[in-house]
Amino acid sequence: MKINNNFNIDSLIDNRDVAIVRGRKTDTFFKVFQVAPNIWIAPERYYGESLNINEDQKSDGGIYDSNFLSTNDEKDEFLQATVKILQRINNNVIGAKLLSLISTAIPFPYEYKPGDYRQTNYLVSKDNQHYYTANLVIFGPGTNIVENNAIYYKKEDSENGMGTMSEIWFQPFLTYKYGQFYVDPALELIKCLIKSLYYLYGIKPSDDLSIPYRLRSELNSFEYSELDMIDFLISGGTEYKLLDTNPYWFTDNYFIDAPKNFEKYKNDYETKIKNNNDIANSIKLYLEQKFKTNAQDIWELNLSYFSTEFEIMMPEIFNNALNHYYRKEYYVIDYFKNYNINGFINGQIKTILPLSKYNKNIINKPELVVNLINENNTVLMKSNVYGDGLKGTMDNFYAAYKIPYNIGDEYHINYSYLNNVNVEEINNIPPINDADIYPYRKNSDPFIPVYNITETKEINTTTPLSVNYLQAQVTNSNDISLSSDFSKVISSKDRSLVYSFLDNTIDYLDSIKYDEPIDTDKKYYLWLKEIFRNYSFDMTETQEVNTPCGINKVVPWLGKALNILNTGNSFIEEFKSLGPISLINKKENITMPKIEIDEIPNSMLNLSFKDLSENLFNRFSKNNSYFEKIYYDFLDQWWTQYYSQYFDLICMAKKSILAQETLIKKIIQKKLSYLIGNSNISSDNLALMNLTTTNTLRDISNESQIAMNNVDSFLNSAAICVFEGNIYSKFISFMEQCINNINKNTREFIQKCTNITENEKLQLINQNIFSSLDFDFLNIENLKSLFSSETALLIKEETSPYELVLYAFQEPDNNAIGDASAKNTSIEYSKDIDLVYGINSDALYLNGSNQSISFSNDFFENGLTNSFSIYFWLRNLGKDTIKSKLIGSKEDNCGWEIYFQDTGLVFNMIDSNGNEKNIYLSDVSNNSWHYITISVDRLKEQLLIFIDDNLVANESIKEILNIYSSNIISLLSENNPSYIEGLTILNKPTTSQEVLNNYFKVLNNSYIRDSNEERLEYNKTYQLYNYVFSDKPICEVKQNNNIYLTINNTNNLNLQPSKFKLLSINSNKQYVQKFDEVIISILGNMEKYIDISEDNRLQLIDNKNGAKKMIISNDMFISNCLTLSCGGKYICLSMKDENHNWMICNNDMSKYLYLWSFK
C-alpha cells in the first residue's frame, strides 16, 4: 500500500487527491487529502461537534480548547504527523494489510431500484459537481482534544452487513504514559482503524450489547462497569483469552447474525454485481477483494496482536480501568525529533517528551471523593477516585442472563490474520473515477454528539482507605522527610513530611542524621550504597505463607502501603488467619446461573437401539458442552467481581512502588545537587559521582521491577486461590444438582422406551449417565496462564538479564563473531582469530599474538550498586604463564579484570578510591576445559567464584565501592594461547544451583542422544532408522557378493533389522559425544564393519582395520537425531533405486535424508 506523503496544507485542489468537500448533513466545508486509495485526511477539527460546550457537558479527564488546530501551520503539522503514523503502520506487513483492507472494504452498493445500484461511500464537492470515493476520513479531534474515536456514517448499514463509510477523530500530538512507557500513537490509530472495519463490513454490534467488565469496589453500592462488545473484541489482551474458549458461556445472536448478514451481501455480489456491466470495474474489483475476508477475520484483529507484530508495549489487562487513583498527564510528540516510521526513535521508555501545556486544563470530575475525617468530623484529607471511562450499571447481569442451550458454539477463533489480503493485487486496482460514482443521497445519519456527564459522589470515612494511603505517599515538594506514621503525616502542616513504609530505609536515614556531613566522594558512595541496599531489602521482601492453595510468597509491606486489613505490622498474621479472600472489600455471593436444558422429546421413544444410541450420545455431548458454558459463567463472575478487585490492588500497589521509588530518587538527587554546588570535591570526581548515581537510579528501578513482579505473583495467586476455594466449589455443588436432574430424566426416559430390550436399556443408561469426572473443568495452570506476563509494568524495554552472549561460527569466507543478547552490542575483533570446536560449539582460538575482541553497549557500565555475573569455558594452552590479560572492563584503573598469572587465573576488582580485591584461581592451566563462573552480588556484598561445579572463592566485597568504568568489555590474548567458548555476562548474581545447572546442561548438550533422548552409549546394541522413514529399520542386502545397507521398503519378511554397535577410538569412553570419531559394527553370525564402496554405498567388511572412521554429531533442531560424516561427506539415504534406498556417502540429498536415529 502506497502512502502519498507529497501533500502540504497549501497543495492545489485537483479534484482527484486534493479537494474541498461538504460534511454530511451540514453546510460545513473542509479540505481533504487522499493519502491512500479511499483513505482521506481532513486536517480540521471534527465538524460534527461544537467547539464550545457548557461546563456540565465536559467529560472527566477531557481537555477543551476551541483554538486548537485553527491555524494553517497547525493543520499542516497535523497532516504531516498523521501521514507519518500511517507510514509507520504501512511499514509493517500486517499493518500494510490492514490499510489495504480498509482501502478495499467499500460498502455494498445500495439497490435504489431493482438492478439500479448506487454508491454510499463518497464525499461531494462544494458545488456538487464532483464525487470522491471514500471509505474513511481521518479528522482532528472533536470537542475534547484528547479523545480518539471512530464513528459510522449510517447506523443501520453498519450493523446489517451492507457496511457504511467511517470517520475518525484523532489526536496525534498528545500521548500519555502507562507506567514507565509512552503509549504509541500508531496503536491508538490502529484501534480506530479496526473499529472502522466493523462499520465498513456492516458487522458492528448493537449499542446495547455490552458485558460486565469490573465490579466498582470503591463505591458503596453494588455497581458494574460495562464494556461495549466492539471495544472488548478490539482491545484484545487478557480479557480476550476468556473469549478464546470453546464453547464460551457468553453468547448472543450477534455472533450468529453478523456473519450471516455479511454472507448475504457476499452472495449478492456473486449473483447481482460481479457480472453487472452497469457497475464500474474498479468497484467490482474492490468488492471482490473485500469479500475474500470475512466477519470472523475482522473479529481476530485486536490490539494485542498488532502490538506484538509492531513490537509496541501496551497495557494487556483491564485497559479501561487503570487510572482510578491518579490523573493522567499528557506529553507532546515532535514528529521531526521524536518519531519516525519505526516509532519513537529512542523507544517507548528512553524517549523523553515534554509535558503538555494542556495538563493544567484537564477537567477534574472524579467519580468519587473520599473524605478522611476524624472523630470531630474534621476533614483530614480528600482523595479522588476517577472513573474508568466506561458506563456503569446497577443491574446484576448474571441474575438476568440465561445461558442458552441451543446456541453459543458458533463463534470460533480462526487466527487468519488477513491471510487473504493481497496487497500487490489491491495496489493494481485502478482508482474509482468521478464518472463511476452514482451516489445514493441518503447514505448517512445526522451526527448527534453524546456527552459523558460525570456526577461526583462523596463519602466520608474515619478509617483510612487505600486511596488515602496512596495519596499520602505523593508530594510535589523537593524537601522530603520520610515517616512511617500515617496519622502524623496527614495531621502535619509540614509539607515535606511524606508517608513511607520503607522501614529499613527510614531507620538508616534516621541513624545518620547526627553523623559527620557527607563531604567526600567516598562518604557519598557509602551513603548511596546503603540507601540502595536498604531500599532493596524493604521493597523486594517476601515471606512464604502456607495457604489452602499451597505456599504463597506474601508481600509483607502491602498492608502498610495500602492499609489493607487495617492491621499495620500484623499483615502476615492476619493473612494467615483470614486467607486470600480477606484482601478484597466486596465478597458478594455468586449468582447461580439460569439454565435451560431441553427435555428428551417423546418422538425418540420408539427409535431402534442404534438410532436411540446415536441420538442420546449427541445429547450427552451437547449437555457436556453446556456444562462447560456454566463453568465459564462462574469463571466470568469471579473475573468481574473478584479478580477486578485484586487487579485494583495490583494497580495501587504498583503505584505505591513508583511513589516510593520517586521519593528515594528525589532524596538522592537532592544530596548530589547539594554536593555539586557546595562541596570541595574535584570536578572529575563530581562527574564520576554523577555518572555513578545515574546507574544507581537505574538499579533502584530494577529493584522496583522485582517488587512489582512480586506483587503480581502474590495477588494473582491469591485471586486464583479464591477461585479454587470459594468459586469452583460452588460450581461443583451446582453441577451436582444439574446432573442429578439430567441423570434422573435420562433413566426415566430410557426405561419408557418400547423398542429395545432390558439389556439394551441398561447399556444406554450406563453410556449416557454423567459422573463427577465428566465435568472436572478446573485447570489451575490454564487459569494461571491468563496472567502469564500481562500485568507487569515494564521498567526496561529489554527484559532479558543477558548483557552479553558471545557466539562464533564458521562461514565460507570468514569467521562470524557476535552477541546474541539483543542489546545492540557493537563488536570489533581481529580478523585472524581462528575457531576450533569446543565443549558445545565453536570456540575462539586466541593464539597469544595480541588478538582482541571488543564489545560495547549501553548495559556494560559498572558502578556502585549493580550486581553481575561472568561465565565462560576456558582451555588454557600455555604452560609457564607470565601475566597476561584475558577479559576486562576497566578505565583509569577502575573496574574489573581477569588475567593469567603463573599457572592460574586472577580476578581483580578495584574501585575509584583504590580499594582492591584480588582472587587467585589455581590449576586452570592444565590444558583441559574448565567452566569459570564469577558472581558479584552488591546487595549481599559477596563475591563467589566457581571452577567447573566447585565453589573455590567466597569473599566479602564490602570495602569495594564504585567500580564505574566504560561500557566496553575486552577479550584479549596478549601472551597466552587459549580457547574461549560461551562468554556470557548477566546483570544479576548467580547462585550455586544455577552454576550447576549451567555446567551440566552444557555437558549434557555435548552428548549424542538416541531416539528416546537417552545418552547414546558405546558398545550397546541399537537399530538404525532414517528420519524420513522412521518406521523402517536399516537392513542388510547381499548384491554381487557384497553386503550393503538399505531400508526395507518392500515389506520383504526375509529382511531383518540389522544390529548396530558404536565403537570408540578411545576405549575408556562410555557415552558418545559430539564430533567423536567412531567405527560402526554390525552384529550377526560374524561381527562386520562399515566401509564405503566405489559407488559410495555403505558396505560391510570383515576386517576392523579397514573400517571407515566416521564423525558423529547431533542435529541442532531435532535433539534425538544425529549425523554421520566421512571424509567431509555425510551419510544419507539415496533416492529409490529399484527396490532399495541405499545408505550412501553423498552431499547432494535433502537435509532430512542425512538425519539418523538409533533405537
UniProtKB/Swiss-Prot annotation:
Name one matching Pfam family. Peptidase_M27
The alphabetized UniProt keywords are: Virulence
**Which residue stretches belong to region N-heavy chain nHN?**
376-795
Q: What induces it?
A: The toxin locus has divergently transcribed operons maximally expressed during early stationary phase. This is part of the p47-ntnh-botA operon. The crude toxin extract was isolated from cells that had been growing statically for 96 hours (at protein level).
Q: Among the entry's GO cellular component annotations, what is one?
A: extracellular region
Summary of subunit composition and partner proteins: Part of a crude toxin extract that includes BoNTA2/NTNH, P47, OrfX2 and OrfX3; OrfX1 was not detected. A purified toxin complex has NTNH and dichain BoNTA2. Forms a highly interlocked heterodimer with botulinum neurotoxin type A2 at pH 6.0, called the minimally functional progenitor toxin complex (M-PTC) (BoNT/A, botA).
Tell me the protein's name: Non-toxic nonhemagglutinin type A
